[in-house]
């Protein structure tokens, strides 16, 4: 099976240099930590995608602050081939209540930027590095 297409990923910033990561329940990268996000639906902008995906996965309502970057990620993980073109956005919480999506997410957890887990899915480590660099400039 091959997954491909346009995706959107969110860095949800919290006080004290914390960001929200999800632990994936689905392949590829089952059991890995990841930034919230997912595939765009037909006719949806990447900005609309990230607002929808964050709500589905975390229960939080967000608005886009700015784009962090555009990426390409491809490979094989868990016997699943993937070829994605994600846009990564910084978003801020404007409502909702944090709760994980049953069946898709194993866990939700806040991590400090100095204590990000090593087992990150896709190219999310690079996205977090780019976000950190953009905060310092």
Walk through the language-model features, giving the residues of each:
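NUDIX/MutT-family hydrolases
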Residues: 90, 99-131
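Short, charged/polar surface micro-motifs in flexible loops or helix N-caps
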Residues: 13-18, 28-29, 41, 70-74, ...
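Conserved N-terminal beta-strand and adjoining loop/helix that marks the start
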Residues: 1-19, 86, 90
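Conserved Nudix-box catalytic region and its N-terminal flanking loop in Nudix hydrolases
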Residues: 18-56
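A generic structural micro-feature
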Residues: 2-4, 32, 79-85, 102-105
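A short coil-to-beta-strand element that immediately follows conserved catalytic motifs
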Residues: 60-70
